[in-house]
Regions:
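General beta-strand structural signal in soluble alpha/beta enzymes
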Residues: 37-40, 93-95, 118-129, 153
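Short, ordered loop/turn segments at secondary-structure junctions
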Residues: 17, 39-44, 76, 97-101, ...
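Generic hydrophobic/aromatic pocket-lining and core-packing "Φ" positions
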Residues: 25, 57, 82-86
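Glycine-rich adenosine-cofactor-binding loop
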Residues: 10-23, 150-156
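Rossmann-fold NAD(P) dinucleotide-binding segment
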Residues: 62-63, 68, 72-99
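Conserved anion/nucleotide-ligand pocket segment
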Residues: 129-156
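Rossmann-fold NAD(P)-binding glycine/threonine-rich loop
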Residues: 98-120
Length: 156
């Protein structure tokens, strides 16, 4: 996670802009997070508060160059979403989704080995770095103040 602390900016892609994903994405934006794109298979071509929505992670990455991927997709599709982000070159992935079948995550674990990827989750609230105005996940921004400490949670 140190690469996040040392970067000038952190550009976030959100995959899964359904009801919950949209609500939490707005909370990230309100905190100051730079959300550069969204991904939703049936909302491609639309936008979420001015943020373009694409039909695939690959297209979103090509057009918006995110550093971080945030996943809110339903459990049956979450492992494929993680792999799609890995294949698209995203190196820091936060998966909020809970209830992913164990065999799906074993597949992800085997796939991620040897790759330059950091996966936080699944079933986690994400992370929050107040001094960088960076909130990736569902941790409430109202519980923190500026300072030298960030919050990382790997389990819900």
């Amino acid at each position: 996670m140190m690469n996040i602390l040392n970067k000038e900016s952190n550009r976030v892609l959100v995959q899964g802009l359904g009801r919950d994903g949209s609500f939490q994405t707005q909370k990230c934006i309100d905190f100051g997070t730079e959300i550069v794109s969204g991904v939703h298979p049936t909302k491609a071509g639309d936008n979420f508060n001015g943020i373009p929505i694409y039909g695939s992670v690959e297209e979103a990455v090509k057009k918006t160059s995110p550093d971080i991927g945030l996943i809110f997709v339903p459990a049956p599709f979450a492992s494929d979403a993680i792999i799609e982000q890995i294949d698209s070159g995203i190196e820091t992935i936060v998966c909020i989704t809970e209830g992913i079948p164990i065999n799906d995550m074993l597949k992800v674990n085997n796939y991620i080995l040897g790759k330059n990827v950091r996966l936080l989750g699944p079933n986690c609230p994400g992370f929050l770095i107040p001094r960088k105005k960076l909130k990736v996940g569902i941790i409430p921004g109202s519980i923190v103040s500026d300072g030298k400490v960030g919050v990382v949670s790997r389990s819900g």
